[in-house]
């Protein structure tokens, strides 16, 4: 384990061991950001990182952006960086991965530490701005490191695996919290879309269905082009169309009226022929069909 805080041994620790081992010490600060560095420790290394992040801060400030505020939770297990209001964990720097910590002697507001990222294995330098607590925060991290190192020596390294498991569980919890936050945002977005859809399909915003106009008797006006469905007979077949009647009597191409066997003359026929004609006329009225009936109309022709 790296003894990066040996230069702070002459300092008097500010907190009780129980406060750092069983709980954590919270601090508020402004987070300037983090940047990759070449070495795991060194004053010149952090000085270059501070200069780089300060320059980036001035650019953001000129653009009207504010430096984000964060909450630091320091314990023997590491340094957590959280969003102050939501308590969402932004970074979880495990203590055994922190290799260097120092406050800036030229700027009493600035403090920094170097931590090795667990995923990329790159060394990242975190820089913070605290108006009154920069040196105190640095000492608190040093005290947490000292207590963790003593526990390591007392246990003979037996608790290293346990702490690795705890660190893995903390990482898993952090990932689940992040996933939970993303799911909440998605649910809120879907609810917002659903409300928008319901409003757009409401009667006030929908298409009004126009009912057909009616006359003063609440009846639909007659339209000569409207389709009239043919009336069906009882057996399901359609009735024959009603023949149209002309205003005038139809005539043939010679101008004569069509032949009518029942009205061809004003004379009387012999009784036998007249009875036959009456029988035929009555049969036609009753729908009689003629099939193979043998009769002669010669006397009729002689009378017409």
UniProtKB/Swiss-Prot annotation:
Keywords: Apoptosis, Coiled coil, Cytoplasm, Lipid transport, Phagocytosis, Phosphoprotein, Transport. Transmembrane segments: none annotated. Residues 159-200 form a coiled coil. Pfam families: PID (PF00640). The modification Phosphothreonine is found at residue 16. GO terms for biological process: apoptotic process; lipid transport; phagocytosis, engulfment. Residues 21-176 form the PID domain. The modification Phosphoserine is found at residue 223. InterPro entries: Adapter_Engulfment-Domain, PH-like_dom_sf, PTB/PI_dom. Detected throughout the brain, particularly in Purkinje cells, hippocampal and cortical neurons (at protein level). One of its GO terms (cellular component) is cytoplasm. Gene3D superfamilies: Pleckstrin-homology domain (PH domain)/Phosphotyrosine-binding domain (PTB). Its main location: cytoplasm. It is found in: Cytoplasm. Belongs to the ced-6 family. Modulates cellular glycosphingolipid and cholesterol transport. May play a role in the internalization of various LRP1 ligands, such as PSAP. May function as an adapter protein. Required for efficient phagocytosis of apoptotic cells. Increases cellular levels of GTP-bound ARF6. Homodimer. Interacts with clathrin and MEGF10. Interacts with GDP-bound ARF6, but not with GTP-bound ARF6. Part of a complex composed of GULP1, ACAP1 and ARF6. Interacts with ACAP1, LRP1 and STAB2. This is PTB domain-containing engulfment adapter protein 1. It comes from Mus musculus (Mouse). The gene is Gulp1.
